[in-house]
UniProtKB/Swiss-Prot annotation:
Family, per entry: Belongs to the Aux/IAA family.
Function: Aux/IAA proteins are short-lived transcriptional factors that function as repressors of early auxin response genes at low auxin concentrations.
GO cellular component, one term: nucleus
Segments carrying motif EAR-like (transcriptional repression): 24-28
Organism: Oryza sativa subsp. japonica (Rice)
Cellular localisation: Nucleus
Keyword Nucleus among record annotations: yes
Entry-linked Pfam families: AUX_IAA (PF02309)
Taxonomic superkingdom: Eukaryota
Chain intervals for the UniProt region annotation (Disordered): 27-50
Protein name: Auxin-responsive protein IAA21
UniProt note on tissues of expression: Highly expressed in flowers. Expressed in roots and seedlings.
Record note on quaternary structure: Homodimers and heterodimers.
Keyword check for Transcription: yes
Length: 266
């Protein structure tokens, strides 16, 4: 009968120790050896608990901690950021100073080929003189220019225009209107030896077809209709905007002097 074989159930034999060394375990490389060395190499009986370290040991752990806590690496980054912010602030201040001290931009002369600087200065100096001449001519233009106004007549199918600057008094204006409108004429009325203002009372407008007296009126700057001849000629030319030849009966509230004359003649 064969002798019984010995079995190492506890794991004290060298073969069991070798099998334990090659056994697969959970953990980082080298953790089992460190646990055995700390336990005194007691054949793996006092195995260290399996743990996963969050941070590696050595210099990597120190650098990571410095970056989080604010060690040397973090201080260098903060110092670099502070210098960049200071440089940007100085650049902004310099730009603001330049803008504040920059002279007012002059009017650019547009053209091609480009105009040199001395030519630009000459043109800039000559512009105020030209403006002064233009203003003087504009002020003198109304005195020497024309003053055209529209002329309408009750019953006439057309309008005319006259230049008031061409006449010196009301009589010349009445003669000009006679030539323009063939349906009325200019006659001499009774003046009782008194000369009228600018010669207006020495003549009267008559409608030859209907035998009625006509009244010459004008519209002033205030858009009010007035009787021609009540103001001096120069004042009339300055304020006249429109002329209208109407019947004396239609100018009851407008020209009482003309209506009174027509009643006395009748």
């Amino acid at each position: 009968m064969a002798p019984p074989q010995e079995r190492d159930y506890i794991g004290l034999s060298p073969a069991a120790a070798a099998a334990l060394a090659t056994e697969l375990r959970l953990g980082l490389p080298g953790t089992a050896e460190e646990a055995e060395s700390e336990g005194g190499g007691g054949g793996g009986t006092d195995a260290a608990p399996l743990t996963l370290e969050l941070l590696p040991k050595g210099g990597a752990k120190r650098g990571f901690a410095d970056a989080i806590v604010g060690g040397p690496a973090g201080q260098r980054r903060e110092a670099a950021g502070g210098k960049a912010a200071a440089a940007a602030a100085e650049a902004e201040e310099e730009e603001e100073k330049k803008k504040a001290q920059a002279p007012a931009a002059k009017a650019q002369v547009v053209g091609w080929p480009p105009i040199r600087s001395y030519r630009k200065n000459t043109m800039a100096m000559s512009q105020p003189a030209l403006k002064g001449k233009d203003d003087g001519e504009a002020k003198q233009a109304p005195a020497s220019g024309c003053l055209y106004v529209k002329v309408s007549m009750d019953g006439a199918p057309y309008l005319r225009k006259v230049d008031l600057k061409m006449y010196k008094n009301y009589k010349e204006l009445s003669l000009a209107l006679e030539k323009m409108f063939s349906c009325f004429t200019v006659g001499h009325g009774e003046s009782n030896g008194k000369s009228g203002r600018d010669g207006l009372s020495d003549c009267r407008l008559m409608d030859l077809k209907n035998g009625t007296e006509l009244v010459l009126t004008y519209e002033d700057k205030d858009e009010d209709w007035m009787l021609v001849g009540d103001v001096p000629w120069r004042m009339f030319t300055d304020s006249c905007r429109r002329l209208r030849i109407m019947k004396g009966s239609d100018a009851v509230g407008l020209a009482p002097r003309a209506t009174d004359k027509s009643k006395n003649r009748n």
